[in-house]
Swiss-Prot record:
Location in the cell: Apical cell membrane; Cell projection; Cell projection, Microvillus membrane; Cell projection, Ruffle membrane
Domain notes: Has three main structural domains: an N-terminal FERM domain, a central alpha-helical domain and a C-terminal actin-binding domain. The FERM domain is organized in a clover-shaped structure that comprises three subdomains identified as F1 (residues 2-82), F2 (residues 96-198), and F3 (residues 204-296). In the active form, the subdomain F3 adopts two mutually exclusive conformational isomers where a row of four phenylalanine side chains (Phe250, Phe255, Phe267 and Phe269) must point in the same direction. In the autoinhibited form, the F3 subdomain interacts with the C-terminal domain (residues 516-581) and stabilizes the structure, selecting only one possible arrangement of phenylalanine side chains.
Region (Disordered): 306-341, 534-560
Known regulation of activity: A head-to-tail association, of the N-terminal and C-terminal halves results in a closed conformation (inactive form) which is incapable of actin or membrane-binding.
The protein's name: Ezrin
Quaternary structure and interacting proteins, as annotated: Interacts with PALS1 and NHERF2. Found in a complex with EZR, PODXL and NHERF2. Interacts with MCC, PLEKHG6, PODXL, SCYL3/PACE1, NHERF1 and TMEM8B. Interacts (when phosphorylated) with FES/FPS. Interacts with dimeric S100P, the interaction may be activating through unmasking of F-actin binding sites. Identified in complexes that contain VIM, EZR, AHNAK, BFSP1, BFSP2, ANK2, PLEC, PRX and spectrin. Detected in a complex composed of at least EZR, AHNAK, PPL and PRX. Interacts with PDPN (via cytoplasmic domain); activates RHOA and promotes epithelial-mesenchymal transition.
Ranges for domain FERM: 2-295
Source species: Bos taurus
Gene name of the record: EZR
Compositional bias per record (Basic and acidic residues), positions renumbered to this chain: 308-341, 535-560
Entries under SUPFAM superfamilies matching the protein: Moesin tail domain, PH domain-like, Second domain of FERM, Ubiquitin-like
């Protein structure tokens, strides 16, 4: 039994490993990959590898994998990538997985500067990429620095502005918050709708020469062939829609395109290498086929896919609405719980205040009672002292009377009697003064006792009011709420007929306008970002593409206006113009 061959296929977000047989064809491997990732819109994609000479090459589906010039290593390395692009992502991409793969590939192209993107658009796209990864901005979850490990905008744009990494993140965070309510899948689609208006989006560029030997670029995309000057990949000069081309062929390095207009000459150019002509031919055939398919009724398979996608989208919207309803209910319960907790805390504080006032009133009452008792004791002592003094005074009066009688009855020495009389008179005066002081003290103590008694009565009334005040209302706890969450040596000449039956006049792509032009919100966001970034821009670091883009903007040109302009005139006139470049 032949030894199996190990193969590794890298998609934009995963690595897949398979073991294939030596006779496995490219289509069998491709089918195995798309089945594994659940992709049905297979016509946009292909398997890319690096050949023995170091050139990126698309795997031929009709040949054995082992018979193609895949670099010999174990495992064999392939990239699963978009080979062809839709004209309008919003109209054509059906499956979410298809949108995601395009989103990741286009984002990588913009961040690596393979697709030129002006600064203001880069920041807006960065915010959609953040919405696509993180969902709605939530300041509780998305703390400062949550974008620290994310590649958000091209390094070129960062180098051209005097802003720190944190300042870039702050700007993108502000715009991230603007996208609140947008589903992750919708954010990816919005990203692509803006990105598809970039001048270099979806274009394969090839170096060519015209008959004069002028170095030019050939751009192959979903709408046709465009010719660019060597120093300007943003602004095509001549365009040929697929509906004007009936045959493409090459002989060695010479490539010939035959227009449908029989009066027009062949469109001839030269590529530097034979393998480039092979790639051009493959891309022309594939893009022309898709161009035709888009202009015909959908096949049964595509109709079924679109119906299924609509049903899935409707189901997601229902689930989203249910989640939003559940989220709002949960937030309402949380708010009610927080409100009740606040009310509980307020009531507890009021209760503590009542208790503190009661304690203070009781202490004040106790202190006043003590003061009243003390005053009463002082009053009694003063009264007793006054009584003693009164008794002494009366005794002195009696003694005086006795002496006066003795003075009358006895004959004594006048001097002795006078001396004794003077002594008793002085003593009586002293006792009289002491009696008056004690009487004043008694009156003062009686007044203070009365004041203390009045304070005691007032305090008892206040305490009675506090103790009889209505208690604070009871605190209700919230109800518990649970939320569940080949080589070409076979020959050097190949030719392909491109049928354009029924679509000769169908060039509605020329009527398109940019997303910014038809979406006022995007237009407003881009204008705001342009104004913000202009203040931090270092004009000395503008690149050649920046200068070209700004000049196009100044002249009012965009991708679709340029497309209309470069297709003006008949086919012969445009071919003559190409030859004259």
């Amino acid at each position: 039994m032949p030894k199996p061959i190990n193969v590794r296929v890298t998609t934009m977000d995963a690595e897949l490993e398979f073991a294939i047989q030596p006779n496995t064809t490219g289509k069998q491997l491709f089918d195995q990959v798309v089945k594994t990732i659940g992709l049905r819109e297979v016509w946009y994609f292909g398997l890319q590898y690096v050949d023995n000479k170091g050139f990126p090459t698309w795997l031929k589906l009709d040949k054995k994998v082992s018979a193609q010039e895949v670099r010999k290593e174990s495992p064999l390395q392939f990239k699963f990538r978009a080979k062809f692009y839709p004209e309008d992502v919003a109209e054509e991409l059906i499956q979410d997985i298809t949108q995601k793969l395009f989103f990741l590939q286009v984002k990588e192209g913009i961040l690596s500067d393979e697709i030129y993107c002006p600064p203001e658009t880069a920041v807006l796209l960065g915010s959609y990429a953040v919405q696509a990864k993180f969902g709605d901005y939530n300041k509780e979850l998305h703390k400062a620095g949550y974008l620290g490990s994310e590649r958000l905008i091209p390094q070129r744009v960062m180098d051209q502005h005097k802003l720190t990494r944190d300042q870039w993140e702050d700007r993108i965070q502000v715009w991230h918050a603007e996208h609140r309510g947008m589903l992750k899948d919708s954010a990816m689609l919005e990203y692509l709708k803006i990105a598809q208006d970039l001048e270099m989006y979806g274009i394969n560029y090839f170096e060519i020469k015209n008959k004069k030997g002028t170095d030019l670029w050939l751009g192959v995309d979903a709408l046709g062939l465009n010719i660019y000057e060597k120093d300007d990949k943003l602004t095509p000069k001549i365009g040929f829609p697929w509906s004007e081309i009936r045959n493409i062929s090459f002989n060695d390095k010479k490539f010939v395109i035959k227009p449908i207009d029989k009066k027009a000459p062949d469109f001839v150019f030269y590529a530097p290498r034979l393998r480039i002509n092979k790639r051009i031919l493959q891309l022309c055939m594939g893009n022309h086929e898709l161009y035709m398919r888009r202009r015909k009724p959908d096949t049964i398979e595509v109709q079924q896919m679109k119906a299924q996608a609509r049903e899935e989208k409707h189901q997601k919207q229902l689930e989203r609405q249910q989640l939003e309803t559940e989220k709002k209910r949960r937030e309402t319960v949380e708010r009610e719980k927080e409100q009740m907790m606040r009310e509980k805390e307020e009531l507890m504080l009021r209760l503590q205040d009542y208790e503190e006032k009661t304690r203070k009133a009781e202490k004040e009452l106790s202190d006043q009672i003590q003061r009243a008792l003390k005053l009463e004791e002082e009053r009694k002592r003063a009264q007793e002292e006054a009584g003693r003094l009164e008794a002494d005074r009366l005794a002195a009066l009696r003694a005086k009377e006795e002496l006066e009688r003795q003075a009358a009855d006895q004959i004594k020495s006048q001097e002795q009697l006078a001396t004794e009389l003077a002594e008793y008179t002085a003593k009586i005066a002293l006792l009289e003064e002491a009696r008056r002081r004690k009487e004043n003290e008694v009156e003062e103590w009686q007044l203070r006792a009365k004041e203390a008694q009045d304070d005691l009565v007032k305090t008892r009334e206040e305490l009675h009011l506090v103790m009889t005040a209505p208690p604070p209302p009871p605190v209700y706890e919230p109800v518990n709420y649970h939320v569940h969450e080949g080589p070409q040596e076979e020959g050097t000449e190949l030719s392909a007929e491109l049928s354009s039956e029924g679509i000769l006049d169908d060039r509605n792509e020329e009527k398109r306008i940019t997303e910014a032009e038809k979406n006022e919100r995007v237009q407003r966001q881009l204008m705001t970002l342009t104004s913000e970034l202009s203040q931090a821009r270092d004009e000395n670091k503008r690149t050649h593409n920046d200068i070209i883009h700004n000049e196009n903007m100044r002249q009012g040109r965009d991708k679709y206006k340029t497309l209309r302009q470069i297709r003006q005139g008949n086919t012969k006139q445009r071919i003559d113009e190409f030859e004259a470049m």
